[in-house]
UniProtKB/Swiss-Prot annotation:
Disulfide bond positions: none
Protein name (record): DNA primase large subunit
Region (Disordered): 461-486
Source species taxonomy: Eukaryota, Metazoa, Chordata, Craniata, Vertebrata
Record-linked Pfam families: DNA_primase_lrg
Subunit (UniProt): Heterodimer of a catalytic subunit PRIM1 and a regulatory subunit PRIM2, also known as the DNA primase complex. Interacts via (C-terminus) with PRIM1. Component of the alpha DNA polymerase complex (also known as the alpha DNA polymerase-primase complex) consisting of four subunits: the catalytic subunit POLA1, the regulatory subunit POLA2, and the primase complex subunits PRIM1 and PRIM2 respectively. Within the complex, POLA1 directly interacts with PRIM2.
SUPFAM superfamilies: PriB N-terminal domain-like
Record function comment: Regulatory subunit of the DNA primase complex and component of the DNA polymerase alpha complex (also known as the alpha DNA polymerase-primase complex) which play an essential role in the initiation of DNA synthesis. During the S phase of the cell cycle, the DNA polymerase alpha complex (composed of a catalytic subunit POLA1, an accessory subunit POLA2 and two primase subunits, the catalytic subunit PRIM1 and the regulatory subunit PRIM2) is recruited to DNA at the replicative forks via direct interactions with MCM10 and WDHD1.
Cofactor(s) recorded in Swiss-Prot or TrEMBL: [4Fe-4S] cluster
Region described as Interdomain linker: 253-270
Cofactor binding: number and manner: Binds 1 [4Fe-4S] cluster.
A GO cellular component entry from the record: alpha DNA polymerase:primase complex
Gene Ontology BP annotations: DNA replication; DNA replication initiation; DNA replication, synthesis of primer
InterPro entries on file: DNA_primase_lsu_euk (IPR016558), DNA_primase_lsu_euk/arc (IPR007238)
Length: 507
């Protein structure tokens, strides 16, 4: 598959050539990849990178960055997803290749809005910080050179000459063996953050920065480089979106869900309608608890609320017949004529179960879909309370849910940092009296099933393991066969020419 008029080429490298492509376990991603990959690998790499960045976000708010626990858990995530992380491991070509290609694929998806760019940059910075923290000291200078950062380590003589001044100006050197610490001579303009914090020694327009502090400068350079690159990529979006081979893969990537498929559960039919009120206070996430309360009080929900809540109920086990009965009973309480419900609303419910129209069996919305699409307006109750409620209203809601003041403060801090899913996870821990829930929350139905697992010991409602599914709707059998056949046909005859992608990242 070719994106430009460049001559196609496929890398066939071995030995030293392979190592030369990726000399380090970390990089600034200055050059786009130039090889061909299949559509299947393109998609697989993209979703693996999304999983990694979401894991980085969750770990970053659950643990102090740089601590032993944070480092070990992040290393485990990177290893599990087969990305590069250590400098001196053998057979690192493939993990570094995966890292390189997947980063550039996600640029295409995450350049589309300011919020997406900000989130992407932050997670990539945290990943770079981790990798730099475990980079051997003897590799730092070559990494800086390859990244075009002209920071030279000063000689031992210069260190000795300025030892007292540097030690007095650099708090990070407290308790560090001076003899083993490298110090870098950096232009003053590149060390402004350290200067503002009075954490660096200045002389003749240069800052003398210990290795422990150089990471702050490297991260600033990386942020500026990546921010500019994303802006350039955003200019090429119309061309990317017009490509029928790329557009389907990128359209939902930024808010895709990569976990459990909650469209069909073994618990189907095990939930009775008279259980819903009780379950809503015990096991519903705030977004669904809010919708249930609004439905009971107003006997009506607008379309966005009906879709979000209806698919959630379907995912926790309501059958089509139960769903029709549930919604009809509630809407009739609101003085709706039963015939009007049967002729209009019942069709939409059957449609969501794949029984009408295109026979698309819709799956419950993931957290990312709720957070990033269809924001609520006046009179709506759908959306994510942590994302779409102002701080005071959210505080009142948490008080109503009997969250202690200290817990509310933690939740509001997470929301202020745009960590909406982690805030919901903290709510889960508070309401279920657990210190660490042991999972990363990505789906309202995941919240429900994890809650039931704790409350019932997994005896009643138990989710079954299934393959991850990323779309928010499941096509009919025939459409699935057609799509699979089409993709197989594309894979057999065409490949992604990543060399041509350079045009999207540099124009």
């Amino acid at each position: 598959m070719q994106f430009s008029g460049r001559t196609r080429k496929k890398l066939r490298l071995a030995g030293d050539q392979r190592n030369a492509c990726y000399p380090h376990s970390l990089q600034f991603y200055l050059q786009p990849p130039t090889e061909n990959i299949s559509l299947t690998e393109f998609e697989s790499l993209a979703f693996d990178r999304v999983k990694l960045l979401k894991a980085i976000e969750n770990l970053g708010v659950s643990y102090v960055k740089g601590t032993e626990q944070y480092q070990s858990k992040l290393e485990a995530e990177i290893r599990k997803l087969k990305f590069s992380y250590r400098e001196n491991l053998e057979d690192e070509y493939e993990p570094r290749r995966r890292d390189h290609i997947s980063h550039f694929i996600l640029r295409l998806a995450y350049c589309q809005s300011e919020d997406l760019r900000r989130w992407f940059i932050q997670q990539e910075m945290d990943l770079l910080r981790f990798r730099f923290s475990i980079l051997p000291k003897d590799k730092v200078q070559s990494f800086l050179k390859d990244t075009h950062l002209h920071f030279e380590a000063i000689s031992d003589e210069e260190k000795t000459l300025r030892e007292q001044d540097i030690m007095a100006s650099s708090p990070s050197l407290s308790g560090v063996r001076w003899e083993s610490e490298s110090v870098y001579k950096v232009p003053f303009a590149d060390a402004l953050d350290l200067f503002r914090g009075r954490k660096v020694y200045l002389e003749d327009g240069f800052a003398y920065v210990p290795l422990k502090d150089i990471v702050a400068i490297i991260l600033n350079e990386f942020r500026a480089t990546l921010s500019k690159a994303l802006a350039l990529t955003a200019r090429s979006l119309p061309a990317v979106q017009s490509d029928e081979r790329l557009q389907p893969l990128l359209s939902h990537l930024s808010h895709s869900y990569t976990g459990q498929d909650y469209s069909t559960q073994k618990s189907t039919g095990k939930i009775s309608l008279d259980q819903i009120d009780s379950l809503s206070t015990k096991s519903f996430p705030p977004c669904m608890r809010q919708l249930h309360k609004a439905l009971r009080e107003n006997h009506h929900l607008r379309h966005g609320g009906r879709m979000q809540y209806g698919l959630f109920l379907k995912g926790i086990g309501l059958t089509l017949e139960q769903a029709l009965q549930f919604w009809k009973q509630e809407f009739i309480k609101g003085k709706m004529d039963p015939d009007k419900f049967d002729k209009g609303y019942s069709y939409n419910i059957r449609h969501s179960f794949g029984k009408e129209g295109k026979r698309t069996d819709y799956t419950p919305f993931s957290c990312m879909k709720i957070i990033l699409t269809n924001p609520p307006s006046q009179g709506d109750f759908h959306g994510c309370p942590f994302r779409h409620s102002d701080a005071e209203l959210l505080k009142q809601k948490m008080q109503t849910y009997k969250i202690p003041a200290s817990g509310i403060s933690q939740i509001l801090d997470l929301v202020k940092g745009n960590h909406y899913q982690v805030a919901c996870q903290k709510y889960f821990e508070m309401t279920h009296n657990v210190d660490d829930c042991g999972f990363s929350l990505n789906h309202p139905n995941q919240f429900f099933f994890e809650s039931q697992r704790i409350l019932t010991g997994g005896k009643d409602i138990k989710k079954e393991a299934s393959h991850p599914e990323t779309p928010q709707h499941k096509p009919s059998t025939q459409k699935t066969k057609d799509a699979t056949s089409a993709l197989a046909s594309l894979d057999s005859s065409l490949e992604m020419d990543l060399e041509g992608l350079e045009d999207y990242f540099s124009k």
